[in-house]
From Swiss-Prot:
This is Mu-conotoxin-like Cal 12.2c. The keyword Secreted applies. The modification 6'-bromotryptophan is found at residues 31, 40. It comes from the Eukaryota. One of its GO terms (cellular component) is extracellular region. It comes from Californiconus californicus (California cone). Keywords: Bromination, Disulfide bond, Hydroxylation, Ion channel impairing toxin, Neurotoxin, Secreted, Toxin.
Length: 43
């Protein structure tokens, strides 16, 4: 919930807002509030 997995995992390309959690990032996980390009992980 609120955690985006790495590109190797499951990522949905459509922009995501992650707070206090590693976000999906083209080059891996990144701690940020807004991570454009990916959605929250369904888990």
């Amino acid at each position: 919930r609120g955690v985006c997995s790495t590109p190797e995992g499951s990522c949905v390309h459509n922009g995501c807002i992650c707070q206090n959690a590693p976000c999906c990032h083209p080059s891996g996980c990144n701690w940020a509030n807004v991570c454009p390009g990916y959605l929250w992980d369904k888990n």
